[in-house]
Amino acid sequence: MGIIVYKPTSPGRRNASVLNYKEIITKTEPEKSLVFTEKKWAGRNNQGRITVRHRGGGHKKKIRIVDFKRDKDGIPAKVEAIEYDPNRTAFLALLCYADGERRYILAPEGLKVGDTVMSGPDADIKVGNALPLKYIPVGTMIHNIELYPGRGGQLVKSAGAVAQLMAKEGKYALIRLPSGELRYVSQECRATIGQVGNLDHENVRIGKAGRKRWMGIRPTVRGSAMNPVDHPHGGGEGKAPIGHPGPLTPWGKPTLGYKTRKKNKPSDKFIVKRRK
């Protein structure tokens, strides 16, 4: 998929580029039965307090209902369309099953309109098919991986992401994740064959602040530009140093390289090699 790079007709255009959606998107309006609207929370919780900073505004979006479970076994589905989804970096594929039901799935790289996909133990090893890990050959590239059988895919779902099935030992399969982490997952968990599409997403340059605002992302202010009451880095005369042994979050916790994973987590025993 190509990238359109704009000529510098204005300061905002100078560094901007966009994906050439016409090359892959085949349908502009979502399937009505598979969307719903949701109130914007702007990073607030049910008490109205900000729990996620730098959120708010942005273009109105409809939420697409995506099938991460891939539990409709043994029924072939035809790819009707490849669609854009404003809520994620990957594209969606609209499937029409032989019994007439329609579902969205993450569109893998190479999946085209007219292709047939299937899920279940009897599915072939081809792009877009979903199977339990025990039926997938070692060395296969996979995405949309479950951590618990039946819960639905939780790992490797963003644009261009791919994991590899490295080995099978007893009840567990060893998977190498995009982060470099090696971890065991139950062989009963499902995964989808192939790599998530939209590989060029990482090469797009936003170009201007306003484009981030369209996405619902607000400015991030440096702590050193604040007052001491607002941030541990704040205050001082001119461009003062941090004044601490290392950088801190707004709440005084160490940051930038500080490990935040909970100690002695029960799932630690499944991680063979920590992420990079």
Swiss-Prot record:
Cross-referenced SUPFAM superfamilies: Nucleic acid-binding proteins, Translation proteins SH3-like domain
Family in the record: Belongs to the universal ribosomal protein uL2 family.
HAMAP family: Ribosomal_uL2_B
Quaternary data: Part of the 50S ribosomal subunit. Forms a bridge to the 30S subunit in the 70S ribosome.
Keyword presence, Iron-sulfur: no
Role, per record: One of the primary rRNA binding proteins. Required for association of the 30S and 50S subunits to form the 70S ribosome, for tRNA binding and peptide bond formation. It has been suggested to have peptidyltransferase activity; this is somewhat controversial. Makes several contacts with the 16S rRNA in the 70S ribosome.
Start-end of Basic and acidic residues biased regions: 265-276
Keyword rRNA-binding part of the UniProt annotation: yes
Record GO terms (molecular function): rRNA binding; structural constituent of ribosome; transferase activity
GO cellular component: large ribosomal subunit
Keywords, in A-Z order: Ribonucleoprotein, Ribosomal protein, RNA-binding, rRNA-binding
Residues covered by region (Disordered): 223-276
Organism, as annotated: Caldicellulosiruptor saccharolyticus (strain ATCC 43494 / DSM 8903 / Tp8T 6331)
Listed Gene3D superfamilies: 2.30.30.30, Nucleic acid-binding proteins (2.40.50.140), Ribosomal protein L2, domain 3 (4.10.950.10)
GO terms (BP aspect): cytoplasmic translation
Stated name of the protein: Large ribosomal subunit protein uL2
Domain of life: Bacteria
A Pfam family reported for this protein in Swiss-Prot or TrEMBL: Ribosomal_L2_C
InterPro entries (alphabetical): NA-bd_OB-fold, Rib_uL2_dom2, Ribosomal_uL2, Ribosomal_uL2_bac/org-type, Ribosomal_uL2_C, Ribosomal_uL2_CS, Ribosomal_uL2_dom3, Ribosomal_uL2_RNA-bd_dom
